[in-house]
């Protein structure tokens, strides 16, 4: 044991131990010199930092966040931009900043509901704080990061618009219901116009309008044409005589005004919201083709009904075109207005304009210019000057234009009913003259900001016209509402039910939609009626010996069943033996009245309306007491006819069955088909066959509105812009 303790150590291990000790001593000596130098340097830097800044204060940062930022849905701010604001705050307050990660934790203490999103194109995306905006009172205020502006994203965090956050899709409005339509109880109906039929028509028309609105929201504009054709050309025969009534025509006008206003609000909620080019193009195409679709769908219907439908649809199309052009101008003007350098130059050029001279020239154009007009021009001039001086966003200019039209047109016209058109014309004349003179003055003086003023002038003009056109549409709807309720003129309204008269055949291939005329007509004596005192409304029925066929340019003359000519004024059987009171007045109803005798039996089945809307009603309508010819419940056959019943593209005429046997054919040439060839499925608007294929298996085309399966959306049959993914539209418009 003692021998073990006195045992000599191994020489190799001893040498390695000595070498290791020497190395460690050298390292300690070197590190001591280095540490002394580092300590001196760190002390100097720490002293400098203590002299330059204060330690970080979280409460001060939270207070700064509360004063400069607020919660705002739909607004995004790049994280880098917000951190730069924070660094600027620390520099101005001599505060030690924390790193970006720690700053993010402080932000969430102030705004717990804040979320982050990665926005931008592939490879260029950046993280953004979503749901926070810069307050207008903040020194960091920028319209692109505020509630008033859209979210803007770029590499610097300021200048490029983020299309992911501003792209608009009408599908976001799915489930939108139309406002209430007129109630038959509130109408002043003539005694001869059955209330049950009017109520039925309003219910049918509301269903039709709701289907059109839902189709527009889904962006299936091609189906609008099919719905128009199916509704008007599939109208049940017993409803046809009331379509020419002025009361029903006014109801259609009021309902169309409601529908068009809803569609306009769905397609473009505001003119300031950026729209993708694909959506703009489709809207303009829809506005262009709507009139042609109505011409085809309303062919052979009463003239007064056609006129009101055409008038309102053309106003609606004009407003859609105005909205699209105005939206483009607003986006271009936004860049100009939000530039501080440009607005400063515009303000300088604006104040160099000779206001007195321009005001005098403007007053020369007015019929009765007064001193109040001069004061109004001066006031508007000063208000615009203030907007430029404050570098207001484009939303402030739009609000100013709204207020101007309200006090110069709406309030003035409200003092005198029916004066809106004249007041609007007078204001528009003054506005146009003043704006033109301002642009002229800037041109003569070579104003540096002339181009910017010209762009703003175009945008202002379009917006004022848009407001005035909207006022005219609303005024027209109010007129129709007053006429519908009997609040218009006190004169007795005489209604005419005149059969469409045939015209001579024309070789022109261009479709002719105006009613044909004939010199001969045959009066139809009505059957006996329990009504003792018939009203002028819905009072008579006359037919002509010449009937117009369901073609655009060719007409046929149909002799009576007995073979006697029309000149002998032989009585013709009334359509469906419907009771019509006697009267000396006539009324225009659609040709071809004897459609059931020749295979035209198509109409609607509105049985599912109760499942679609909460209005109490039955799925089938009982027999109407005023109509003795209808003995049982009404059930309308489905519209989709067989080729034998309704040969759309058949070269032979649909009237051929009635021209067989002893009646000679008057025209040996084939009849032009009723419906023109429609574009192929590769175009934006598909043919009605697509609708038939989709709904043809159902006996009721007005099924409850449900979301379609993903497989039902054929990408080639819808306009480019929607890509239907998992039942929802991820729009290509955002690209």
Swiss-Prot record:
Annotated segments matching region Disordered: 27-59, 504-540
GO biological process terms held by the UniProt record: cilium assembly; negative regulation of smoothened signaling pathway; positive regulation of transcription by RNA polymerase II; regulation of protein processing; regulation of transcription by RNA polymerase II; telencephalon development
Record GO terms (molecular function): DNA-binding transcription activator activity, RNA polymerase II-specific; DNA-binding transcription factor activity, RNA polymerase II-specific; RNA polymerase II cis-regulatory region sequence-specific DNA binding; sequence-specific double-stranded DNA binding
Residues covered by region (Necessary for dimerization): 315-487
Tree of life domain: Eukaryota
Compositionally biased tracts (Polar residues): 32-41
InterPro entries membership: DNA-bd_RFX, RFX-like, WH-like_DNA-bd_sf, WH_DNA-bd_sf
A GO CC annotation given for this chain: nucleus
Pfam families hit by this protein: BCD_RFX, RFX_DNA_binding
Location of the protein in the cell: Nucleus
Tissues in which the protein is found: Isoform 1: Expressed in brain and gliomas (at protein level). Isoform 2: Testis-specific (at protein level). Isoform 3: Testis-specific (at protein level). Isoform 3: Expressed at a higher level in adult testes and ejaculated spermatozoa than in fetal testes. Isoform 4: Testis-specific.
Keywords: Activator, DNA-binding, Nucleus, Transcription, Transcription regulation
Feature: DNA-binding region: 44-126, 61-136
Known function: Transcription factor that plays a role in early brain development. May activate transcription by interacting directly with the X-box. May activate transcription from CX3CL1 promoter through the X-box during brain development. May be required for neural tube ciliogenesis during embryogenesis.
Entry-linked PANTHER family: RFX TRANSCRIPTION FACTOR FAMILY, TRANSCRIPTION FACTOR RFX4
Subunit structure: Homodimer. Heterodimer with RFX2 and RFX3. Interacts with GPS2.
Family: Belongs to the RFX family.
Protein name stated in the entry: Transcription factor RFX4
């Amino acid at each position: 044991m003692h021998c073990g303790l006195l045992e000599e150590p191994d020489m190799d291990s001893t040498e390695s131990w000595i070498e290791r000790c020497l190395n460690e001593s050298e390292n300690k000596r070197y590190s001591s010199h280095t540490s002394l130098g580092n300590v001196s340097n760190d002390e100097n830097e720490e002293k400098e930092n203590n002299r330059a800044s204060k330690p970080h204060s979280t409460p001060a940062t939270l207070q700064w966040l509360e004063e400069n930022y607020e919660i705002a849905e739909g607004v995004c701010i790049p994280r880098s931009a917000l951190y730069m604001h924070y660094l600027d705050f620390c520099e101005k307050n001599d505060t030690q900043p924390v790193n970006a990660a720690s700053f993010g934790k402080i932000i969430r203490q102030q705004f717990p509901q804040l979320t982050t999103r990665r926005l931008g194109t592939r490879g260029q995306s950046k993280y953004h704080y979503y749901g926070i905006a810069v307050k207008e009172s903040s020194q960091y205020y920028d319209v692109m990061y505020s509630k008033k502006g859209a979210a803007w994203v770029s590499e610097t965090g300021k200048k490029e618009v983020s299309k992911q956050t501003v792209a608009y899709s009408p599908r976001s409005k799915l489930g939108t219901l139309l406002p209430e339509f007129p109630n038959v109880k509130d109408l002043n109906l003539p005694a001869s116009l059955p209330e049950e039929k009017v109520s039925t028509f309003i219910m049918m028309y509301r269903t039709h309008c709701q289907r059109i609105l839902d189709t527009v929201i889904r962006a299936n504009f091609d189906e609008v044409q099919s719905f128009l054709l199916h509704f008007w050309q599939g109208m049940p025969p017993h409803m046809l005589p009331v379509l020419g009534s002025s009361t029903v025509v006014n109801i259609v006008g009021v309902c169309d005004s409601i529908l068009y206003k809803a569609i306009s609000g769905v397609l473009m909620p505001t003119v300031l919201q950026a729209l993708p080019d694909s959506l703009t193009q489709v809207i303009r195409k829809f506005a262009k083709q709507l009139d042609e679709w109505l011409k085809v769908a309303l062919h052979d219907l009463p003239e007064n009904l056609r006129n009101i439908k055409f008038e309102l649809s053309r106003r609606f199309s004009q407003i859609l075109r105005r909205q699209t052009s105005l939206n483009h101008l607003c986006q271009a003007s936004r860049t100009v207005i939000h530039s501080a350098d440009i607005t400063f130059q515009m303000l300088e050029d604006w104040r160099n304009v000779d206001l007195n001279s321009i005001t005098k020239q403007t007053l020369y154009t007015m019929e009765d210019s007064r001193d109040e007009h001069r004061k109004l021009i001066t006031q508007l001039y000063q208000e615009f000057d203030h907007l430029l001086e404050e570098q207001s966003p484009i939303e402030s200019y739009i609000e100013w234009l709204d207020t101007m039209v309200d006090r110069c047109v709406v309030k003035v016209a409200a003092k005198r009913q029916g004066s809106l058109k004249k007041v609007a014309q007078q204001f528009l004349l003054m506005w146009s003259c003043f704006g033109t003179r301002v642009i002229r003055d800037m041109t003569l003086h070579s104003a540096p900001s002339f181009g910017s003023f010209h762009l703003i002038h175009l945008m202002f003009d379009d917006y004022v016209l848009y407001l005035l056109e909207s006022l005219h549409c609303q005024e027209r709807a109010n007129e129709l509402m007053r006429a519908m309720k009997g609040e218009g003129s006190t004169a007795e309204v005489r209604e005419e039910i005149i059969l469409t008269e045939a015209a001579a055949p024309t070789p022109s291939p261009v479709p002719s939609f105006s009613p044909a005329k004939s010199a001969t007509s045959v009066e139809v004596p009505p059957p006996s009626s329990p009504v003792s005192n018939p009203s002028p409304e819905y009072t008579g029925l006359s037919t002509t010996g010449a009937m117009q066929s369901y073609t655009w340019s060719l007409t046929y003359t149909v002799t009576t069943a007995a073979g006697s000519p029309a000149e002998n004024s032989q009585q013709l059987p009334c359509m469906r033996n419907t009771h019509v009171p006697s009267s000396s007045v006539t009324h225009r109803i659609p040709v071809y009245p004897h459609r059931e005798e020749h295979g035209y039996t198509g109409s609607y089945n509105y049985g599912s309306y109760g499942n679609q809307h909460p209005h109490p009603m039955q799925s089938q309508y009982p027999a109407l007491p005023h109509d003795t010819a209808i003995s049982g419940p009404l059930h309308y056959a489905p519209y989709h006819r067989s080729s034998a019943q309704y040969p759309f593209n058949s070269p032979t005429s649909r009237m051929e069955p009635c021209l067989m046997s002893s009646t000679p054919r008057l025209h040996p040439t084939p009849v032009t088909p009723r419906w023109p060839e429609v574009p192929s499925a590769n175009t934006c608007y598909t043919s009605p066959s697509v609708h038939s294929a989709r709904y043809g298996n159902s006996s009721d085309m007005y099924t409850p509105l449900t979301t379609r399966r993903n497989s039902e959306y054929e990408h080639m049959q819808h306009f480019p812009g929607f890509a239907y993914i998992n039942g929802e539209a991820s729009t290509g418009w955002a690209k």
